[in-house]
Amino acid sequence: FIKPDAKIEDAYATYYMGIFFPCDDRVHQPRDFRVQGLHKNAAMILGLDEGTEAPDVYIKLTPKNRQRQIKEPYVCIAAQASGQAKYWNNGRGWINVVKYLKQKGYRVLCIDRDSVYGQGSRFNLIPYGAEDFTGQIPLQERIDLLQYADFFIGLSSGLSWVANGMGKPVIMISGFTLPLNEFYTPYRLINY
C-alpha cells in the first residue's frame, strides 16, 4: 500500500478503498455501500466479479488452540460496531437475549474489543448479564473462543464475518444496511 503523502510518478491506476461520508459521494464510491455492500463495491471498483461468494478465495478461519477451554455450552455475542447507526438501539434487546440464552442453559460470552464504546454523548456498554471476554487481545483468541460456541449473535460488523468464516451459525442484527450488504444467513433480525 502507498501512504497518502507518497508521490508516485508512474502508477497505472490508484483507488480509494473504504467508506466515505457523506454517503451520496459518488466520486469515491460509485454506489452507496449500504445498498450494494462493501464486498461488492470493492469488486466493482477493481473490475472483479461482483458475485456474493468467490469459491476460489474462500478462507476458512481456524483456531490455534484446539482444546476446549470452557466445558459448559456457550454462545458468543458482539454488541459493538464501528458506528452508532449499526448498533442494536433497542433498549431491552440485548438484555432479553442474554436472559433468554441463560434460561436455556448457555453461558453468554461477549467477545467485543471494548466493554464500553462510543463517541460524543452516545456510549454502549457490554450487555447486562453477559460475561466479559472483551479486551485488547489478538483476533486469534476470539477465533479460539468462537470455535466451540454453539452459535454467534452480532451486528453488521467484523466479528460476524469472522464467525461466518469459521462456519458458525450467525444471527445477524442489522438495520443500518440492507440484508444483501452482508453475507447470507437465514438468521437475521432486522432493526428498521
What are these regions (language model features)?
Residues 1-192:
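Catalytic machinery of carbohydrate-active enzymes
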